[in-house]
Amino acid sequence: MTSTLDPVLTAADAALRTLFARPHATRAAPAPAQAPGEMTDSERREAGALMRVNHVGEVCAQALYTAQAAVARDPVLRARLLEASHEEADHLAWTRQRLDELGARPSVLNPLWYAGAFGLGLVAGRLGDPLSLGFVAETERQVEAHLESHLGRLPAADSASRAVVEQMKIDEAQHAAQAIDAGAAELPAPAKALMRLASRVMTTVAHRI
C-alpha cells in the first residue's frame, strides 16, 4: 500500500512546493560577466515579462518530470527523472529571484500551467519509457531554442538575467543529451508540432499575465 501511495505523495508534495513555497537553489545564481547596467522602465518591464515566461517554463518542467516519474516503469528512469527535476529546481529559484529583483510578478496562471503540464507528463509516461524519454528530449530541445531567442530579446543592460538564461540553456542541452543517451525514441513530427503550438500559447499568455 505504501509503495502505491509513494508516487502520489511525491507528486502532491512537488506541486505544493512548486506553486506555493519559495524555491531554493542548490547552486548559486550564475554571476554575470559584467555588472548590470541601467535599464529604462520599458526595458525593465520587458525583462520582467521574459523572465516570467522562463519561470512558467520551469513550473511546467517540475510538473512534467514529476508526472513522468510517477508512472515510469523502470526504477532507474524514475530516479533519473526525479534527479532532473531537482536540477531544474535551480532554474525555478533563479528565475523567481530575477522576477523579484526586476519588480515583476510570477504568472497568476501558474496553477493552470502546472496542471496542464502534469497531465501531459502523465500521458507521455503512459506511452512507455522510450517515448517518455523522447518527450523529455524534445521538450528540452524546444526550451533550449526558446532560451536562445530570449538572449536576443533581453536588454543588453540586464546582464544578470542573461547570465541565468545562458546557464539554463546549457543545462537544458545536457538534459536532452542525457535523455537521448538513456534510450529516448524520436517523437513523430505531428507530436513535435503540437508541443511547439502549446509552447507558443503558454509563452504568449505568460508574457502578459
From Swiss-Prot:
It comes from Variovorax paradoxus (strain S110). Its EC number is 1.14.99.60. Catalyzes the hydroxylation of 2-nonaprenyl-3-methyl-6-methoxy-1,4-benzoquinol during ubiquinone biosynthesis. The lineage of its organism: Bacteria, Pseudomonadati, Pseudomonadota, Betaproteobacteria, Burkholderiales. Residues 23-36 have a biased composition (Low complexity). The gene is coq7. Keywords: Cell membrane, Iron, Membrane, Metal-binding, Monooxygenase, Oxidoreductase, Ubiquinone biosynthesis. This is 3-demethoxyubiquinol 3-hydroxylase. It comes from the Bacteria. It catalyses: a 5-methoxy-2-methyl-3-(all-trans-polyprenyl)benzene-1,4-diol + AH2 + O2 = a 3-demethylubiquinol + A + H2O.
